[in-house]
Structure formats: structure tokens, C-alpha cells
Swiss-Prot record:
GO terms classed as biological process: bacterial-type flagellum-dependent cell motility
The encoding gene: flgH2
Protein name: Flagellar L-ring protein 2
GO cellular component: bacterial-type flagellum basal body, distal rod, L ring; cell outer membrane
Residue positions bearing lipid (S-diacylglycerol cysteine): C18
């Protein structure tokens, strides 16, 4: 009977560990939402008797910044955030109730006198801080030009290292006015930005918590 109860305890631990575990699916390169837009890159036929093609001409003083679907744009990553928070709570309460000893006639019953005292105190505090910093560059592609003229950009960069891969993915909306003459834009000037920097492989796996650690960190553990 004892071994049966132990078996049930082990089974419960395993089931709870599986319930609290979050499966991580490694990302794959060439995701459709980050791939360059599918365009027809073939040159249109020139007009009869002319070598001029209107859509593929460039004047001497033309702006070389990205502004069309399919153009490339370099995003300079300059992200740094920090946050801190502190909270404290403290309160106390005390009360006292006294019942005087009753007197009957001329006799006083001191043993029947009652005195009740009570006090309660609570003191709690908490603090947290977090900081992130990301610097680098990634060249993305213009996927769409919205009716108001802003550009919807998207792209990814993969780096194959010794023990795994690292990748940067970025999507967002950029104003043409924020693009410099060098066809660059700061990541701080991107609206609705989605920036992902992560990795996969041996190094990424070594930083992942095992199933037993995830069990003790899950909400199912009452301690």
C-alpha cells in the first residue's frame, strides 16, 4: 500500500510538471511574413523605337531613399530600456477590552474580572528592476506603402555561429521623412515596432529550464 501511494505521488508530480511546461518551437528562417515581397522583377518592354522605361529610370538628382515596395532600408538598432518599481505596506492595530469585577452587596468578586488585549501588525515590501539594451543594424524590405505615404517594413537576419544560430526579426511602420540620406532609420523612429532577438541551438538550450525546475516554478506548487 505504501508503494502505491508513492507511485501516485510521483505520477502527480510528473503530470503537474507537464502541465506547467511551455513547449518552445524553434523558429525557422525564411518565414513568409519576413520574406521580401513577391514582385515581378522582369523589365517591361520599351516603347517602339525608344530605350526609355519610365518605371526604371533615375534622374541625376533623384532621392535614393526607400519609398517603393521592394526597396531596401537599413534600420539602426538603438534600443535601451530600464524600469524599477518599489512598493511597501505597513499597518498595525491594537485593541483592549476590560470587564470590571462585579460587586454583589459588599462582596467584590475579583476573580470574575476580565481583561482582553490584542494587537496585529503587518509590514511588507517589494522591489523589482529590469533593463534591456540592443544595438546593431538590420536591412529590411518595404512591403507596403500605405495611403498616407508611410512605409510598412519587415525583414530578418540570421547568423550561424559555432554552437547555434542567432536571429533578428523586425516589423514596423516608418515615415519617409525619418529616413536619412544614407537610407537609414533609427529603430526609435519606427511605429508599431516588433523587434525579436533570440537564438536556437546548444547555447539557447543550455539557458532553458528543465521540466522539474519548471514544475517548482509553476503556479501548482503551493510553497
Amino acid at each position: 500500500m505504501k508503494w502505491l501511494s508513492k507511485s501516485w505521488a510521483v505520477a502527480v508530480v510528473l503530470l503537474v510538471g507537464c502541465a506547467g511546461r511551455q513547449e518552445f518551437i524553434p523558429p525557422q528562417p525564411n518565414a513568409e511574413e519576413y520574406a521580401p515581397p513577391k514582385l515581378d522583377y522582369t523589365l517591361p518592354d520599351a516603347q517602339s523605337g525608344s530605350l526609355y522605361r519610365h518605371q526604371y529610370t533615375m534622374t541625376l538628382f533623384q532621392d535614393r531613399r526607400a519609398y517603393r515596395v521592394g526597396d531596401v532600408l537599413t534600420v539602426v538598432l538603438s534600443e535601451e530600456t530600464s524600469s524599477s518599481k518599489k512598493a511597501g505596506t505597513k499597518f498595525g492595530k491594537s485593541s483592549a477590552v476590560n470587564f470590571a469585577a462585579p460587586t454583589i452587596g459588599t462582596k467584590k468578586f475579583d476573580e470574575l474580572g476580565v481583561s482582553i488585549d490584542g494587537s496585529r501588525n503587518f509590514d511588507g515590501s517589494a522591489s523589482s528592476s529590469q533593463g534591456n539594451k540592443l544595438q546593431g543594424a538590420i536591412t529590411v524590405t518595404v512591403h507596403d506603402v500605405l495611403p498616407n505615404g508611410v512605409l510598412r517594413i519587415s525583414g530578418e537576419k540570421w547568423l550561424r555561429l559555432n554552437q547555434g544560430d542567432e536571429f533578428i526579426r523586425l516589423t514596423g511602420i516608418v515615415r519617409v521623412d525619418d529616413i536619412t540620406r544614407n537610407n537609414q532609420v533609427s529603430s526609435q523612429r519606427i511605429a508599431d515596432a516588433r523587434i525579436t532577438y533570440a537564438g536556437r541551438g546548444a547555447l539557447a538550450d543550455s539557458n532553458a529550464a528543465g521540466w522539474l525546475t519548471q514544475f517548482f516554478n509553476s503556479p501548482w506548487v503551493p510553497f
